[in-house]
Amino acid sequence: MSSNQELVVLGKLGSSHGIKGWLKITSYTDSVEGIFDYSPWLIKEQGVWREVKVAQWRFQGKAVVAELEGVATREHAQMLTNCEIAIMPEQMKDLDDSEFYHRDLIGCEVTNINGYNMGIVDQIVETGSNDVLLIKANAKDAFGKAERMIPFVPEQFIKQVDLQGKQILVDWDPDF
């Protein structure tokens, strides 16, 4: 199948639930049930990625559980515990021009409107009100910063995003 780097990880399989092979699901999608909008899933079982399809799923209290095709026993389900759930990138939904997947922003070079290179996006932190770019500063940062946190607020702080060129233009003081 595909290498791990090409895949988009959407969640992971949790512990078994019941005796018929159901599994708890940890979803990294915006809504917990959003993970079920994608099919087939890829899971890494014994070092090999393979396709699986969800036969059915449901909410179980605050958790989400699913039955996977071909997994009919508790023992088989237990062997899948902690396996990542991934999809191929082409399965991702198309976004509007003003929307971005976090994975596409990671690795972008961030420059402020005065031309100062702020560093590289290392991760995105979800705060509830807006996402925040965690920027790993250059080793020889003139302001002695190791990292910066810039709110991802289009127009106010984020002036331009060029995914092809892996560039983000921001209105942000490098000393802040």
Curated annotation (Swiss-Prot):
GO terms for biological process: ribosomal small subunit biogenesis; rRNA processing. The keyword Cytoplasm applies. One of its GO terms (cellular component) is ribosome. InterPro entries: PRC_barrel-like_sf, PRC_RimM, RimM, RimM_N, RimM_N_sf, Transl_B-barrel_sf. It is found in: Cytoplasm. Its main location: cytoplasm. Keywords: Chaperone, Cytoplasm, Ribosome biogenesis, rRNA processing. Pfam families: PRC_RimM, RimM. One of its GO terms (molecular function) is ribosome binding. Residues 97-176 form the PRC barrel domain. The PRC barrel domain binds ribosomal protein uS19. Belongs to the RimM family. PANTHER family: RIBOSOME MATURATION FACTOR RIMM. An accessory protein needed during the final step in the assembly of 30S ribosomal subunit, possibly for assembly of the head region. Essential for efficient processing of 16S rRNA. May be needed both before and after RbfA during the maturation of 16S rRNA. It has affinity for free ribosomal 30S subunits but not for 70S ribosomes. Binds ribosomal protein uS19. HAMAP family: Ribosome_mat_RimM. This is Ribosome maturation factor RimM. It comes from Shewanella frigidimarina (strain NCIMB 400). The lineage of its organism: Bacteria, Pseudomonadati, Pseudomonadota, Gammaproteobacteria, Alteromonadales.
